[in-house]
Amino acid sequence: MEKFSDAVSEALEKAFELAKNSKHSYVTENHLLKSLLQNPGSLFCLVIKDVHGNLGLLTSAVDDALRREPTVVEGTAVASPSPSLQQLLLNAHQEARSMGDEYLSGDHLLLAFWRSTKEPFASWRKTVKTTSEALKELITKLRQGSRMDSPSAEENLKGLEKYCKNLTVLAREGKLDPVIGRDEEIRRTIQVLSRRTKNNPMLIGEPGVGKTAIAEGLALRIVQGDVPESLKEKHLYVLDMGALIAGAKYRGEFEERLKSVLKGVEASEGECILFIDEVHTLVGAGATDGAMDAANLLKPALARGTLHCIGATTLNEYQKYIEKDAALERRFQPIFVTEPSLEDAVFILRGLREKYEIFHGVRITEGALNAAVVLSYRYITDRFLPDKAIDLIDEAASLIRMQIGSLPLPIDEKERELSALIVKQEAIKREQAPAYQEEAEDMQKAIDRVKEELAALRLRWDEEKGLITGLKEKKNALENLKFAEEEAERTADYNRVAELRYSLIPSLEEEIHLAEEALNQRDGRLLQEEVDERLIAQVVANWTGIPVQKMLEGESEKLLVLEESLEERVVGQPFAIAAVSDSIRAARVGLSDPQRPLGVFLFLGPTGVGKTELAKALAELLFNKEEAMIRFDMTEYMEKHSVSKLIGSPPGYVGYEEGGSLSEALRRRPYSVVLFDEIEKADKEVFNILLQIFDDGILTDSKKRKVNCKNALFIMTSNIGSQELADYCTKKGTIVDKEAVLSVVAPALKNYFSPEFINRIDDILPFVPLTTEDIVKIVGIQMNRVALRLLERKISLTWDDSLVLFLSEQGYDSAFGARPLKRLIQQKVVTMLSKALLKGDIKPGMAVELTMAKDVVVFKIKTNPAV
């Protein structure tokens, strides 16, 4: 027969290959049997499993028979089919014809083998106790009316088992995580499944909120019998789209596979429920020119009610794919799955804690669970609970597990110390002088001492590792006993339940308790096997780059003296520094409004008085680097259309996929200082965008994605009213009343900004012109920066009062602020020092003292042994 199914063709090729490699002259039915048994998912093997045949026993018998086959000398004729194999194929051909099939498949071969008297199959067949007629009935039932009318038809039989995973079987075997909470959603799913029509629930929710977990929870309830009568003994299958599509080479093959799955569900007569995760992938899947996509194949079965289906997808994909197809949408009943509250998320983590403790062999504290939920909610804003909190716990536990398997730091340090001593000892041995003899003896004593300490540390390490490993094994055993108890209760084996519940489990729990106490009572532990909130904070810091640590005493002290820290960089602006410091303190202790940004400030004042410098100082103080400041020069946003630069271009315009500069920056670095420089130069459309940010702490970009801005500090600088401010300060001298200063610039502010914009600003901070004393302090700050750069080259720099007086007089202009001072230092000091360095007049190890001589900066050089 020329027409073989793909599986049989492949088996025949392997049989010929096997005979060739084994140097056999003939390809016998045993070669074919061996190649058929090598594919446990084939129809041939599936039928044998259904009649409870022992595949392992048959494989061993075939291997023995093949070893007894005579071999030929290499280089002789190619192996040819034996007469017995030809007769077997002829018998299989007759079976196919009698069943009305066009292609010879694995079940036809099995029927032919069953009627054969050839060994070893004939002997093995007697162990099965099934007649050929009963076998044929089983195959007919298995086929569910399908005929072998294409080469791939055999693969598509039992499509449900091949392309789906049985969740209820996994639940019965204890391979699913417990599903905590979500009772309302599971109850709603059961309610929809129990309807007469439109009984297909669609779980819709953001990624990571637990849609798949609801399907797993339903499978667990079915196994436990905690479902209505209409759902008892049902099987929940999850469709594997990857397996369904993979390897579908020819047109129509994908549709054929999907139809086989649907046929399997329909043939179960309501006993099977199909769960399709990421159901939107079905829309368009498999569609080519003239072919239907998978969704269209589902519609008739969904409409008739023969397909019981649960779908799961995200809200965006539902709107993009499902809602567009009204015929598909109406066949599903939406169930919205929302993100759990913080309390519910902690409750979910408590239920999962034991699974992760057993897997990683660590202990997870209650504080770690709370920290995982709170910190992930606060700092990881682009993902959803409980998924992100579970990931934190998992990664923190894996970190501890990795440390347990690695060399502890004290042992590593001792080994390094020992290596250094041995190297030193070898160097001393090379010296033959008697003076070194005593030092060599001392070195040997030190090496012996370190070796003893190292041996003691290694012994402690091995003991601790043994205790931790033993504890993990006991917890694994406890989990197995609890699963066995549930299984015994399901099968009504109450003697076994009593033995487990009142004897074995309490005994093992007591052993675990004693082992934990023994581990906790050890002094000077080398290994940490506990996941706590500090470790969770460390993982969050690794993920986000934000220094998330519990507030230490050192940080508390730093926050209390925040004004002094800022005044080291920004001089003469007490109003601004005090207001900003108060805002940061409130945010750090958690008393600021959680629904708004950390702070929104408008810095007003003339140029060069420290507005931008204060923003840089804040970024360095809060996030340890000036680069944490995101700066926008608002002169680039003077046109109406330039607002798209901030939030992204609208659909259809160039740059739509790239996103906006503000939205993308805040998405990647939600903890930042955002500076809008010269805000008054921006177009009014920009202010409308800022209203939403300042009020709700949310920015919606052009793709309708919400960006969390609640952890950013927003600072705007402006020169509005700077002339009025300067005139007022000149007239009044020392300024002590901030409100009086603001009343001077209020009219100018109202001309530029709308009332609703001004109303959303936390504080408007006037920056007053600098005084002579302020300029002297700034000279000191700028000169210290130059001195620090020279100190890196081992050069000490000092200066006298004459230089300070010269720079403060020549470098300050009330119209330009302190910026000319920086230029003057660059011209008069830095340029002169750089020339001296290039000439070799100044070298590392020298001290340079700057002074003035007839309005010229000069320096004295002397050797500086201290540097």
Swiss-Prot record:
SMART domains: AAA, ClpB_D2-small. Keywords: ATP-binding, Chaperone, Coiled coil, Cytoplasm, Nucleotide-binding, Repeat, Stress response. Residues 4-69 are annotated as: Repeat 1. Residues 1-145 form the Clp R domain. Residues 340-545 are annotated as: Linker. The keyword Nucleotide-binding applies. Pfam families: AAA, AAA_2, AAA_lid_9, Clp_N, ClpB_D2-small. Residues 555-769 are annotated as: NBD2. One of its GO terms (molecular function) is ATP hydrolysis activity. Signal peptide: none annotated. One of its GO terms (cellular component) is cytoplasm. Homohexamer. The oligomerization is ATP-dependent. The Clp repeat (R) domain probably functions as a substrate-discriminating domain, recruiting aggregated proteins to the ClpB hexamer and/or stabilizing bound proteins. The NBD2 domain is responsible for oligomerization, whereas the NBD1 domain stabilizes the hexamer probably in an ATP-dependent manner. The movement of the coiled-coil domain is essential for ClpB ability to rescue proteins from an aggregated state, probably by pulling apart large aggregated proteins, which are bound between the coiled-coils motifs of adjacent ClpB subunits in the functional hexamer. Part of a stress-induced multi-chaperone system, it is involved in the recovery of the cell from heat-induced damage, in cooperation with DnaK, DnaJ and GrpE. Acts before DnaK, in the processing of protein aggregates. Protein binding stimulates the ATPase activity; ATP hydrolysis unfolds the denatured protein aggregates, which probably helps expose new hydrophobic binding sites on the surface of ClpB-bound aggregates, contributing to the solubilization and refolding of denatured protein aggregates by DnaK. This is Chaperone protein ClpB. It comes from Chlamydia trachomatis serovar D (strain ATCC VR-885 / DSM 19411 / UW-3/Cx). The gene is clpB.
